[in-house]
């Protein structure tokens, strides 16, 4: 019993020391305010992320392409997202998760802009590939940011809250773009709406 108690004390001291080391990485906010900023930012990036993923097939049909072509473009987009999730992991190890998130979100916003003018089959393939390569590492960066900048003792709760808000962003993003299309019969304003939400994310992460 004494050995297990001693081991537990050593473990707790190591955790406390690690938290102290993390506290040396200064952020100009309290832990809770930093958490709130990340939750708001996560909504912004995921509203932007959801529009191509939810609406790429209807967009293709709207441009006179077949549903099969739309499915192929979506599959390639998601495959590229898997690749970028791995690539951005390596990048995060080098430059840190905050900068990685800023780069990924900025690139995602640029590719969202490209969806508006490039609506041919070739253009949609190219832009969808670029979009997939830009967005795969965004959501995992939030977990790494929490682990790096916030206390370990409640990391799981904080990460769970952020992921919850990313899902909210994905949900309302796809819905808003569809609603805008219903009113305008065009996806251009839907993508513009996503770009503006994505810009909110970029501004928050840049501010942090």
Locate predicted features.
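A membrane-interface helix-boundary motif in multi-pass transporters
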Residues: 179-197
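Interfacial helix-cap and linker-helix signal at transmembrane-aqueous boundaries
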Residues: 60-61, 91-92, 176-185
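Intracellular juxtamembrane helix-capping segments at the cytosolic ends
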Residues: 137-150
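Structural signature of the two symmetry-related core transmembrane helices
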Residues: 99-114
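Multi-pass alpha-helical transporter architecture, strongest
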Residues: 193-208
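Single conserved hydrophobic/aromatic residue that forms the stacking wall/gate
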Residues: 1-11
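Paired small-residue
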Residues: 111, 122-130
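Extracytoplasmic gate region of multi-pass secondary transporters
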Residues: 31-86
